[in-house]
Regions:
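Glycine/charge-rich catalytic "coupling/switch" loops of P-loop NTPases
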Residues: 3, 26, 33-75, 101-115
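Short, conserved beta-turn/loop elements at beta-strand boundaries and strand-helix junctions
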Residues: 9-15, 76-82
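A generic beta-sheet turn/junction motif
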Residues: 13, 22-24, 48, 80
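Short, acidic/hydrophobic/Gly-rich beta-strand patch recurrent on exposed beta strands
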Residues: 17-23, 30, 84-90, 95-96
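A short, compositionally biased micro-patch
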Residues: 79, 88-90, 100, 108
Length: 115
């Protein structure tokens, strides 16, 4: 989890699109429920599952993902099936991907990647 400030809230038919700023990075999330106490300018903690993160060596184009964070792999543990790593950039978090994906990307500690 990391701290962020809400900079935009769009709502239509009970669905909320929320813009955040965290560490100078603009992020966006879509939510089915949102507390009525949250407003533009509210400070919040943002969290997501470590399995919800995609990693790439290059900027992605032609995909529906809006969030892109530049950073570095600080630690990496490669198992037979899963790979856990620590991603650090302007915000930091843990990532869980398949060992096969980590090997295909030839990921190593110290590599710069996009999440």
């Amino acid at each position: 989890m990391f701290r962020a400030r809400i900079n935009e809230i769009l709502q239509k038919d009970g669905i909320h699109s929320v813009g955040f700023i965290a560490g100078g990075i603009k992020l966006r999330g879509v939510f089915l429920q949102l507390s009525s106490e949250l407003k533009v300018g509210s400070e919040v903690y943002v969290g997501f599952k470590s399995t919800d993160v995609l990693l790439s060596r290059e900027a992605l184009s032609g995909v529906s993902s809006e969030n892109e964070i530049h950073g570095k792999i600080m630690s990496l543990s490669l198992g037979e099936i899963l790979c856990t790593l620590r991603f650090e950039g302007k915000i930091s978090f843990d990532v869980l991907i398949s060992a096969h994906s980590a090997q295909e990307l030839a990921l190593r500690e110290g590599d710069e990647v996009l999440a």
